[in-house]
Amino acid sequence: MASFTLDLLAQLPEAYQAFSPLIDILPLIPVFFLLLAFVWQASVGFR
């Protein structure tokens, strides 16, 4: 059982290799929302 778990964990990086570009972009999403808030406030005139 333990060796099966270790084998599964060893295969995970290969399984998620296709999502590598997505994982590079994910940390930028909060920055995008912060900038969106500034653009929104600028459009309504910083009420």
Curated annotation (Swiss-Prot):
PSII is composed of 1 copy each of membrane proteins PsbA, PsbB, PsbC, PsbD, PsbE, PsbF, PsbH, PsbI, PsbJ, PsbK, PsbL, PsbM, PsbT, PsbX, PsbY, PsbZ, Psb30/Ycf12, peripheral proteins PsbO, CyanoQ (PsbQ), PsbU, PsbV and a large number of cofactors. It forms dimeric complexes. This is Photosystem II reaction center protein K. One of its GO terms (cellular component) is photosystem II reaction center. One of its GO terms (biological process) is photosynthesis. The chain crosses the membrane at residues 19-39. The gene is psbK. Pfam families: PsbK. It comes from Parasynechococcus marenigrum (strain WH8102). Its main location: membrane.
